[in-house]
From Swiss-Prot:
The Asp-Asp-Xaa-Xaa-Asp/Glu (DDXXD/E) motif is important for the catalytic activity, presumably through binding to Mg(2+). Mg(2+) 3 binds at residues 500, 504, 508. CDD domains: Terpene_cyclase_plant_C1 (cd00684). This is Terpenoid synthase 30. Mg(2+) 1 binds at residues 356, 360. GO terms for biological process: diterpenoid biosynthetic process; terpenoid biosynthetic process.
Amino acid sequence: MAVARTVFGLGTLSYLHQAPLFLKTSQSLFPRPSLSLKPMKHDFVCVKATTKSSTSDDLESGRPSILFSPSIWGDYFLSVSVDDSEFDDIAREIESVMKPYVRDRLISSHNSNKDKIRLIHLLISLGISYYFESEIEMILNKAFEELDMIIAEEDDLETISIMFEVFRLYQHKMSCDSFVRFKGEDGRLKESLVGDVRGMLQLYQAAHLGTPSDQYIMEEAKSFTRNHLESLVESTTIPPHFSSHIRDALYIDRYHNMEILVARKYISFYEQEEGHDLTLLKFGKLSFNYCRLHYIQELKTLTKWWKDQDIPSNLPCVRDRIVETYFPTLGLYFEPRFSLGRIIIAKMTIIVVALNDVCDSYATYPEAKSLIDSLQRWDIEAIDELPNYSRIVLRLILETIGEIEREMKPRGRSASVQHTIDETKSLGRAYLALSKWASEGYMPTFDEYMEVGEVTGGMDDFALYSFIAMEDCDEKPLYEWFDSKPKILQALSVLYRINNDIVTYEREMSKGEVVNGVNSYMNQHGVTKEEAVEELRKMARDNYKIVMEELLTITDVPRPVLVRCLNLARLFDVFCKHGNDEFTYPHGNLKDLITSIFIHPIPV
């Protein structure tokens, strides 16, 4: 299998259909019915459980009620046809035409370092830089050694900002002092910069790559550019497509967004730019469509697997979100070669969702304790001691991870699976701690809550799942690093826990679930909800900067591993923008994003 390759070639096309975790589909297997892209009727499911073991009023009064909407997508993706010849046609053109064209430009001695860095930035924006990682790293390593000379006379804000972004993304800590040249005698950014709209937008994006050590200048740049861009976006002097581009950036900047979503938007923007490179534009479109074909195949596999589990009908207390669970896996790695990794992450995530929902929204504390105790034993025989719904959850967990183990063991990735088992047990213990607090009516301090909440956030687990299929990374040192609880993973855990608690606060309070980050912060510090939320948001921003700092300072971990961590940090705003819990209620913006990636190919 070609999972570990840096780029794909024609010879790797068949691997998607060869692995046991993938479902080979054809039009005859899944005939297309008359389907609509309109969401299904969203009748909410309210469940009050009964069990064989007890029907006492005391037991049932201690059981939560659940209110989740059914899946928007159902079995839709089983009906979407994929033509294998389209894979071949796109890959052939990329290999024979597109890649040689770009590679020639990257290695040409006629192009300056500045020109090459601007080209690299464009490749990143179009979502095609991953084809040229070795060339890019070679160019940037050499250019960074000559950085002072390269930027000595440079006074173009857009160019400096682009270089800042590219170098930092590739772990070269270009100093934010490079922006001092754009300050006036009063020490503030010059007002004359406002006329350079492209430079202002690029500085705004670059400012999101700041670290704790360069906080002042980056925060000033972010505030300065945002204030002026908000005014400029309504200006009639700016072309409509550029005004829309600014508006998108102000809504969610690219470094708090998924790479594939950035590329999808940027391709449309770039097509409207005067003097755009037709070959690069076509490359971006072909690459996106090629990725999309992989995603559809993967969704077929996952939809069929999830349908076979029959969890929604057996456990309506579990959120039926297989498509929404798969979608963020594109945030970790969107490249075609990571198909296996995305399927593994999606399966692991949905079983964690099932465990969480049962413990959080259905089981009484004694039942949750029995389930988690059985999970710790990791023994299929333990299911006989559990009520029916707990048996379903435990069997789902054990069988899914067993399936992954059978897939990865021949690849020499057994340590990955054992770490996954250990982390799943740890997650279960943390869920049980929350269940115990709820059953006792105990309100922990914020510090107590975060000790458990950082575990239930599951960012360690999500990062771990992403490592499983990274076959080009040596297992032993990778998991030694993981076991050391590195600062970057701690920051991700805090970042997720805080963002999640802010957006789920109202839903949880309406269900009577008072143990959350917002409430515990209010309780410990004696502040209002609004004050608590503001402090938590500041804490989240600070931890994002820690992630960036660690990306730039860690030298003994392969860059692809650290990029997975950065990509995790980029996910949160996609699901938590403006206080909406998009995963639980995916009927608005998240549905539109999913549609833009999976449903609509880009016309070439």
